[in-house]
């Protein structure tokens, strides 16, 4: 990478206050799927640095430190993010790939973790609803609040039947915009961080939903350090960041939010 590009990334990352001074000419929605959580803390720090709220989609995924992302050991992390005003949706409990639609509203599902790992199973509509709701049960135990009525299928692959079943359970599916695919799961040998950053800064448009992970197994050179210059650069372009609670397509989907902390204020 050239010195000039290094300098640009460093300049963007170091200028949160100047970015905040820019007028808001558009809105983007930054979202994160759990992944292996290797960069969860650093990403949370970047969001605090820039005073940006994001939306997190939670699955109980195996982490880089050997536990699972919704184990009690992560309770403090989720509680802190909830207190900071971020939004949260379901990414299914076992991070399962959704297969072709089955009969009678059933969903074919291949869990990545836990029971039936690596096997395609058929979940009844009731069981699929339970799979969607289970991350919320852990989240509520740790934070005192509910998940927002949103979900994202692992890989973004949701069939018409799964979408319909989830909707009956009260969940709206959230896909990302084409320009919002930040590419953090692509091979770094062919998709450098600098190229992915430049592509996002060039192509993201008003209303786009952006997607990355809190850690990913499939990339050697992690993209997480680019979140800092990405946020700064988009602010320099005049974008404001909002959670999906403020997205016009999902606003009506939200149930009442219960925060244990709010009762003590």
Regions from the language model: what does each represent?
Residues 157-203, 238-250:
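His/Asp/Glu-enriched short active-site or ligand-binding loop at hydrolase and phosphoryl-transfer sites
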Residues 14-17:
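N-terminal signal peptide c-region/cleavage motif recognized by signal peptidases
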Residues 70-74, 192-196, 223-227:
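Charged helix-capping and loop-helix junction motifs
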Residues 22, 54, 64, 219-265:
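C-terminal domain-boundary segment and adjacent tail
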């Amino acid at each position: 990478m050239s010195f000039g590009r290094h300098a640009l990334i460093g300049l963007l990352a170091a200028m949160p206050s100047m970015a905040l001074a820019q007028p808001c000419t558009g809105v983007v929605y930054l979202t994160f799927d759990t992944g292996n959580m290797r960069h969860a803390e650093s990403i949370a720090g970047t969001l605090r640095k820039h005073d940006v709220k994001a939306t997190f989609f939670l699955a109980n995924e195996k982490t880089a430190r050997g536990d699972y992302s919704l184990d009690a050991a992560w309770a403090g992390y989720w509680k802190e993010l909830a207190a900071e005003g971020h939004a949260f949706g379901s990414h299914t409990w076992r991070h399962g790939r959704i297969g072709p639609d089955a009969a009678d509203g059933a969903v074919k599902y291949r869990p990545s973790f836990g029971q039936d790992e690596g096997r395609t199973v058929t979940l009844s509509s009731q069981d699929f609803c339970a799979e969607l709701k289970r991350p919320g049960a852990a989240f509520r135990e740790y934070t005192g609040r509910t998940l927002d009525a949103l979900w994202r299928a692992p890989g973004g692959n949701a069939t018409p039947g799964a979408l319909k079943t989830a909707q009956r359970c009260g969940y709206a599916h959230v896909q990302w915009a084409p320009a919002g695919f930040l590419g953090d799961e692509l091979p770094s040998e062919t998709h450098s961080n600098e190229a992915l950053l430049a592509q996002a800064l060039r192509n993201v448009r008003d209303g786009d939903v952006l997607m990355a992970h809190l850690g990913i197994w499939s990339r050697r050179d992690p993209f997480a350090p680019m979140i800092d210059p990405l946020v700064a650069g988009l602010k320099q372009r005049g974008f404001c960041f909002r959670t999906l609670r403020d997205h016009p397509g999902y606003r009506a989907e939200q149930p009442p939010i219960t925060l244990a902390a709010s009762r003590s204020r």
